[in-house]
């Protein structure tokens, strides 16, 4: 389920368990003939001496009936690798990764002949996300969808070009539907912001004009930076 959901599970006694699950914060209504799909749920009840037998039967059930298949066989998904950047703190991929480091890492993969199918650039590539001294981070700067030119002076295209040079694709993380208050998008188009009661707005994707602008902005970023895969997140 791609939206926010919840599952509250509690053991009341040695012989009973309670479960409440669904879409978190759902407060809506439907017009006649309208319908929506709620999150699906699957419960497995097991009784036996070895709970691992139950675990394994559940896994087999998921593999057999709920795993994407191509020609009757489990689908092969692209092998990917992110641009991991370790300590010392506060350095990590979100704060200290630069174009030079990313390109060097791609070449290192090539040197040892372990190039993945996809190189994945995770969150933090946009403006202000690395400003940890002012308590900024990847999560509280979404809505500033311009490439951080201090870390990537020529945009993301040089990283993409290097990935393509070694035979890989380039994937980039996005979360454009969540817009932090005070961010670039929030300031430019307050009329398209829906207040979610948090530090972030939700972009009004139900507004046709807003949706068109939204797609143009993200599409331009993808085209200009040589992005092959769009990675959608929603926090």
Residue spans for each PLM region:
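N-terminal accessory beta-strand-rich subdomains and adjacent acidic, glycine-rich linkers
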Residues: 1-64
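Sequence-level motif detector for i,i+2 pairs with an aromatic at +2
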Residues: 14, 74-77
């Amino acid at each position: 389920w791609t939206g926010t959901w919840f599952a509250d599970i509690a053991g009341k006694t040695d012989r009973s368990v309670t479960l409440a699950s669904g879409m978190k914060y759902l407060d809506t209504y439907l017009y006649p003939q309208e319908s929506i799909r709620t999150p699906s749920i699957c419960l497995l009840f097991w009784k036996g001496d070895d709970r691992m037998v139950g675990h394994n039967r559940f896994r087999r059930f998921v593999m057999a009936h709920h795993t994407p298949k191509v020609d009757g066989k489990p689908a092969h998904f692209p092998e990917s690798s992110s641009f991991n950047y370790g300590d010392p703190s506060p350095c990590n991929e979100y704060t200290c990764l630069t174009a030079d480091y990313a390109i060097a890492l791609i070449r290192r993969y090539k040197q040892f002949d372990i190039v993945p199918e996809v190189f994945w650039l995770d969150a933090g590539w946009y403006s202000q996300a690395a400003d940890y001294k002012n308590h900024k981070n990847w999560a509280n700067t979404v809505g500033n969808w311009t490439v951080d030119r201090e870390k990537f002076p020529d945009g993301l295209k040089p990283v993409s070009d290097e990935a393509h040079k070694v035979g890989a694709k380039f994937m980039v993380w996005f979360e454009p539907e969540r817009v932090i208050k005070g961010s670039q998008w929030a300031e430019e188009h307050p009329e398209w912001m829906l207040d979610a009661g948090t530090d972030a707005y939700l972009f009004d994707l139900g507004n046709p004009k807003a949706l068109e602008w939204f797609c143009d902005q993200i599409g331009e970023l993808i085209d200009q930076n040589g992005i092959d895969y769009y990675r959608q997140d929603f926090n």
